[in-house]
């Protein structure tokens, strides 16, 4: 499980969560992403959050360990460029065609139903780039509901306990 905190939250609840961590409530959120059966090497994926204005809020996971390919995760790379801690403890192996990536992160309850969005960018070596490949509103009604992806992503969803 990846512990995840967001230093850029603008809500009063989030500020309280940062100032009074003993009172902060969080829950594990599991993001499941099924890749399409494409021809090619393993996919690099960036799973990250944006706020209600579409600004980068934090990285949940990056699949793929060769940093030279991160620039092909174009939206994530552009949005997260100023975050020098974006990769601390959140990287793993690339994901093969037709395979599934499951990421679990502890997210503050203040993020749920507050306009945040889970975004997933994907890139495959020697294939064309496009992003974002999937967007999930971080809302209670969206939990458990699959969303169709684009290009390399067949579908994705997030689940709450």
Please give the residue ranges for each predicted region:
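Glycine-rich, aromatic-bearing surface loops/beta-hairpins
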Residues: 107-109, 113-161
């Amino acid at each position: 499980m990846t512990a995840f905190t967001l230093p850029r939250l603008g809500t009063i609840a989030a500020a309280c969560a940062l100032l009074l961590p003993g009172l902060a409530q969080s829950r594990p959120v599991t993001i499941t992403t099924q890749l399409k059966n494409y021809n090619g090497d393993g996919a690099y994926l960036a799973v990250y959050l944006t706020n209600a204005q579409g600004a980068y809020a934090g990285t949940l996971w990056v699949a793929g360990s060769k940093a030279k390919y991160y620039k092909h995760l174009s939206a994530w790379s552009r949005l997260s460029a100023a975050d020098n801690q974006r990769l601390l403890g959140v990287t793993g192996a690339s994901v093969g065609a037709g395979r599934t990536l499951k990421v679990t992160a502890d997210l503050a309850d203040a993020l749920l139903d507050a306009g945040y969005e889970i975004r997933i960018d994907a890139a495959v070596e020697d294939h064309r780039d496009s992003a974002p490949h999937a967007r999930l509103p971080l809302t209670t009604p969206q939990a458990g509901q699959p969303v169709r992806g684009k290009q390399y992503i067949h579908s994705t969803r997030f689940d709450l306990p």
